[in-house]
Amino acid sequence: MSTFRIEEADRPHVIRLAILWVILSVIGVIAVLQIQIPPGDETVQGADQTRTLSLMTAMATPVFIGVVMMIIYSAIYFRRKGRELVDGPPMLGNAPVQVVWITVSTIMVLFLAFVGITELATNSSAQTVPGQSSGTAAAGGSEMQVQVIAQQWYFTYRYADYSGVETTHLYLPVDRPVELHVTSLDIIHSFWAYQLGVKADANPGVDNVFHVTPQKLGSFQVRCAELCGIWHGEMADSQGQVVSQSDFDSWIAQQQQDYAAIQKVVPSYAPFYFPLPLTKGS
Amino acid sequence: MVRRLSFTAAGVVIVIILVIAFVGLFMLRRPGTLEGTPTTIHLETVAAVGAANEWPRPDDPHPDWVGYLPTTILRVPANSTINMQIDQEDGATGLRNPFWGKVFGTEGGNMHMTYFDDKGNPQEGDMTSIDPTQAAHTFAIPDLGVFVPLLGVNSNAPAGSTNVITFSFKTKGPGIYHWQCFVPCAAKTVFGNGGPMQTLGYMAGELIVS
């Protein structure tokens, strides 16, 4: 193994690059940390995602700056002069440099993988529950169950803990863990409430479970993230709300009152539904 | 060689022009606009646009498609009360989501309907919901929170009968609001949501608020 040695002539370049890299990296990381990376902190899960994305972006910034800086620096200082076509000096491998480079890269990638997997395995855990037929929803647990039902071209919501009342907007109480059950009545949709940090496929016959805990009062948007027909672009709702528990209680009571008119003919709350006919006239 | 290249280049240019023309014509093709007088809209829903009672379109490229007539592009004033009358001539298909059997977002939270009961006798009344299995169509403007189910004509009603549904709703500020049917009423398409459900001028429409 050859020893790591810097040629005398290269030292000014190395020192210059190192100083420049440190300064630009510090500036870059500080700048990156000022960016409000979505989804934000409206939910515990969203805050975790934002934190993870910020960490990953901050770690990637010095690498990005180093690569771009080397390219620009080389293009300026090591530019071929004159019109004569001459091969550059032969470049042989430098084992110490390669060892450092591979080791540092491996440590960074493994660290980021550990952070990402840990994040996925804890706060933003999702669970898909394919089933065979409609049945009753799993009851109990401290989380409030809310079912998201996609259909061309609107989302409706059923609250299992409130006699399965169905609503046209999604209201969630603050500081209360929620278990979202996402399904579809027709084709594939995708429930995307990015401020909540949730993006879940809505597939017919599938109960796609996501967990979310709102921690800030405010509104959020819901939209479909799966191309689903002529009004896909309109399959959105900006009236999602995170409200206080007392406001939620008032709202859900009103919804239950309104729902009474149709409750008898709406099927019981189930993980998913298979309404018929699949083809009109078939 | 030059001649062959010229023919090839000319062919490519012609194909490109044809493709652009086809796409352009497709995108420019829109149904006409119905302007309220000034806040009243009268529509008709039929099982086949070629065989409607009031505004038949026998020359339509899809005369057997279900549709709203005379058009699905509606222009109405902003921040106004719109009085709707829908003459519903189609039979029941049923809702995929029974929840839409309830009336939402209308003035008074209800609709007025003349219809025919199971014995074929004419009936009339204000309603806040209908049996979801007996829905023929819905008139829904999701961004305005307006969802109105339209009862299918009873099979025991006299031939050519029409259910007349009237209701009012308020518009918001200027903008283009899509409206749609939640009944999967496109016959012989998967989930009943193909063809006319995906095409402006049949079961898909725009409410232009200006």
Locations of the language-model features?
Chain B
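Extracellular/periplasmic metallocenter environments
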Residues: G11, I20-R29, G109-D126, I130-S210
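Extracytoplasmic entry segments of secretory-pathway proteins
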Residues: M1-S129
